[in-house]
Amino acid sequence: YYKLKLECLVVLGGNGSQKTANLLREEGLNVIHLPKTIDNDLWGTDMTFGFQSAINVACNAIDCIHTTAASHNRVFIVEVMGHKVGWLTLYAGVASGADIILLPEIPYDINKVVEAIEKRNKQGKGFTILAVAEGAISKEDAKLSKKELKKKRENSKHPTVSYELAEEITRL
């Protein structure tokens, strides 16, 4: 910084970049942090750089799946990035017409998910598209401590929430 005779460092990024920028500021450097994250989870921002682009990509993926899901009467689970926040999944799910949206902020009840799928089938809608945030969690898992949940996931044959959901939906 000083060797290069910089007057200011501009940092683009999410939570980690924001923390690093703040540490550099505390060391006396002039730092500007620009919020760039698809998660849209930085306090004080309405919409971060990258969020709208990520919505478009997720919407395109869900839109492309609609035809296949409808023509083959299937249940599709689309897992959307976002870590522990569901903004991207919510926006993309609503914009693309997902039938069920599961967010990390609202633990889901697998029985209610299955009931919603069965209800759609009874209404003559032979397909269902679920938009699921990667951090979505069941009500049962939400009761576990962080340590217990980590251990459960490490010992699970399901690498992501989508695999877990698919197995549960098939089982029920």
How should these model regions be labeled?
Residues G16, I38, A136:
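Short, glycine/serine-rich, charged loops/turns that create anion-binding
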